[in-house]
C-alpha cells in the first residue's frame, strides 16, 4: 500500500513540475505614427557625372517615447523621478518594410537609394529627400562636379617585396606566397583606378602595380616580385631582444643595401618584416613605416606639392640613399597576413602606405588646430577632415575635437569613407584631387620614377 502512495505522490510532483510556463512575446516593431523624424545623409556632397560613380543615400529614422528620468535635487538632496520625452534612433529591422524611400527633387524614387548620372550639367545642384507616409526629411543638396581630366598615360610601377626572414633558431620563420602578393597589388591597382568602389567622388589614377619579373642583375626571378633575405643568427642577435625592432630593421636594410635595396629607378621597394608586435588603431608605426617623397626635380616649384618638405634634385640613385625609406617602405608581416590584428576594426590595406609613398596625406585630424587655413588637412579640397575618435565607422561627420556641431562657420556634413587614407573606411578609392596629387608626384619626384624603366619586366634597359 505504501508503495502505491509513494508512486502517487511522485506522479503528482512530476505533473506539477512540468506545468507549462506562461510566455509573453513583445512586438518591438514601430508603427508609422510612432516615427517623429527622418534624417537623410549622403556619401558625399559632390557627384562625378560619369555614369560609374554613384551617390548613396542613407536614412536615419527617429521616434519619441516618454520615459522616466531619475535624479537628485542639488538643493534638497532629495531623489526624484519625472517623465520626459526622449528621441531615439529606430533600428531598420523594426520599421515597416519599404516604408521609407528616397526621392529626387522631381519626386522620382531612387532605386536602391543610389543616384548616378551622365546628363546632369556640371555645377547643377540636385536636391533629394526621404519620405515615409506624410513625414519627409529636410532636402539634401548634391552638387554635380566637373568631369576630371583623366587623359593620363597609364603607368606601370614594378614592385619587389623583400622578405626579411629571421633564423629559425631564434624566431619562427615565415614565407609569403607570390599569389598573395599578386592579390594584394591587384586590389591596390583596382582602388587606384575606380574599379571596386561606388564612391561618388572617386578618381582614376591610371597607375598599375605589378610584381617585377627580373632581378637587379637582369636574371629572371624564380618567384616574381619576391626577394628573400635570410638574416643570420649573429645579425638577428645583434638586433636585441625587444619585441619592437623598427630602428634595427631599418639599419639592417641600409647596411645590406646591395642585396635588399634595389635601384629606385627600376623598382618600388617594400620590405616585409616582423618589426613590432605592438598594435594601434592608426597603424602608422605598427603596420608600416614610410616617408613621403623627399626630392623634386628643379623644373618644378617646391611649393607645387604642399604639405611635404622636399629639396631640389634632378636624379635619385642608389648612391643617394641615406635612409631606405626614401625609396620604399617597411611593412609589418602581421598587417599583411591578418589585417585586423594590428589595427583592430580599422582594417589594414596595402593601398594606404602605397598612396602615402606617392605623396598623398592622411585625412584624419585629431585636433582642430591641425587644419590648414582652408579647413583642410591633406591639401585635397574634395576630401573631408575628421576626428577618427568621434567616428570609428565608415559613416562619419566633419566635426572635430573642440568644435561644437552647431558651429556656423563649419556646418555639419556627414559622409561615407571610401578613401584609402581614411581610418575605419572601405579603403577602395582615391578622390579626384588625390589622384591629381599622385600624378604630380610621379611626374615631379625622381625617387618615384621606377615606372619609367622596363628593366623589371624585361631585364634590359
List where the protein language model places each region.
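Sec-dependent bacterial lipoprotein signal peptides
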Residues: 1-17
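Propeptide-to-catalytic entry region of secreted or membrane-anchored zinc metalloproteases
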Residues: 103, 133-264, 275, 443-450, ...
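Short, aromatic- and glycine-rich surface loops/edge beta-strands on solvent-exposed regions
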Residues: 121-134
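Active-site-proximal segment of zinc-dependent metalloprotease catalytic domains
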Residues: 247-366
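Extracellular/periplasmic catalytic domains that process cell-envelope and extracellular macromolecules
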Residues: 150-155, 201-203, 260-266, 318-325, ...
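The catalytic-center signature of Zn2+-dependent metalloproteases
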Residues: 324, 329-430
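Bacterial Sec-dependent N-terminal signal peptides
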Residues: 12-45, 461
Amino acid at each position: 500500500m505504501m508503495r502505491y502512495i509513494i508512486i502517487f505522490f511522485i506522479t503528482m510532483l512530476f505533473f506539477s513540475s512540468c506545468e507549462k510556463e506562461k510566455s509573453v512575446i513583445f512586438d518591438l516593431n514601430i508603427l508609422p505614427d510612432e516615427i517623429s523624424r527622418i534624417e537623410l545623409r549622403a556619401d558625399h556632397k559632390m557627384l562625378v557625372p560619369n555614369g560609374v560613380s554613384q551617390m548613396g543615400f542613407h536614412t536615419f529614422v527617429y521616434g519619441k517615447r516618454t520615459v522616466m528620468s531619475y535624479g537628485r535635487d542639488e538643493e534638497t538632496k532629495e531623489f526624484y523621478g519625472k517623465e520626459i520625452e526622449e528621441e531615439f534612433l529606430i533600428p531598420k529591422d523594426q520599421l515597416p518594410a519599404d516604408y521609407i524611400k528616397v526621392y529626387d527633387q522631381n519626386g522620382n524614387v531612387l532605386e536602391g537609394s543610389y543616384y548616378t548620372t551622365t546628363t546632369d550639367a556640371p555645377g547643377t545642384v540636385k536636391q533629394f529627400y526621404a519620405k515615409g507616409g506624410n513625414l519627409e526629411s529636410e532636402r539634401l543638396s548634391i552638387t554635380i562636379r566637373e568631369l576630371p581630366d583623366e587623359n593620363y598615360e597609364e603607368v606601370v610601377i614594378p614592385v619587389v617585396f623583400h622578405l626579411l626572414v629571421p633564423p629559425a633558431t631564434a624566431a619562427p620563420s615565415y614565407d609569403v606566397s607570390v599569389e598573395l602578393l599578386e592579390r594584394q597589388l591587384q586590389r591596390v591597382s583596382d582602388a587606384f583606378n575606380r574599379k571596386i568602389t561606388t564612391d561618388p567622388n572617386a578618381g582614376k589614377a591610371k597607375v598599375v602595380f605589378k610584381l617585377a619579373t627580373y632581378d637587379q642583375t637582369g636574371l629572371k626571378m624564380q618567384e616574381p616580385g619576391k626577394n628573400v633575405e635570410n638574416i643570420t643568427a649573429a645579425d638577428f642577435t645583434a638586433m636585441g631582444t625587444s619585441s619592437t625592432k623598427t630602428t634595427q630593421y631599418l639599419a639592417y636594410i641600409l647596411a645590406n643595401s646591395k642585396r635588399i635595396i634595389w635601384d629606385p629607378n627600376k623598382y618600388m621597394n617594400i620590405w616585409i618584416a616582423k618589426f613590432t608586435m605592438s598594435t594601434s588603431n592608426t597603424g602608422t608605426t605598427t603596420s608600416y613605416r614610410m616617408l613621403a617623397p623627399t626630392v623634386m626635380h628643379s623644373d618644378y616649384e617646391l611649393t607645387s606639392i604642399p604639405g611635404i618638405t622636399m629639396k631640389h634634385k634632378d636624379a635619385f640613385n642608389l648612391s643617394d640613399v641615406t635612409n631606405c625609406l626614401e625609396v620604399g617602405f617597411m611593412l609589418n608581416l602581421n598587417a599583411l597576413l591578418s589585417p585586423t590584428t594590428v589595427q583592430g576594426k580599422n582594417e589594414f590595406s596595402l593601398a594606404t602606405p602605397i598612396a602615402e609613398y606617392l605623396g598623398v596625406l592622411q585625412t584624419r585630424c585629431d585636433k582642430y588646430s591641425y587644419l590648414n587655413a582652408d579647413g583642410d588637412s591633406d591639401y585635397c579640397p574634395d576630401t573631408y577632415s575628421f576626428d577618427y575618435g568621434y567616428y570609428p565607422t565608415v559613416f562619419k561627420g566633419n566635426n572635430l575635437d573642440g568644435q561644437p556641431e552647431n558651429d556656423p562657420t563649419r556646418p555639419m556634413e556627414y559622409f561615407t569613407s571610401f578613401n584609402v587614407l581614411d581610418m575605419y573606411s572601405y579603403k577602395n578609392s582615391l578622390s579626384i584631387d588625390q589622384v591629381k596629387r599622385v600624378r604630380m608626384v610621379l611626374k615631379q619626384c625622381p625617387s618615384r620614377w621606377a615606372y619609367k624603366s622596363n628593366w623589371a619586366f624585361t631585364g634590359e634597359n
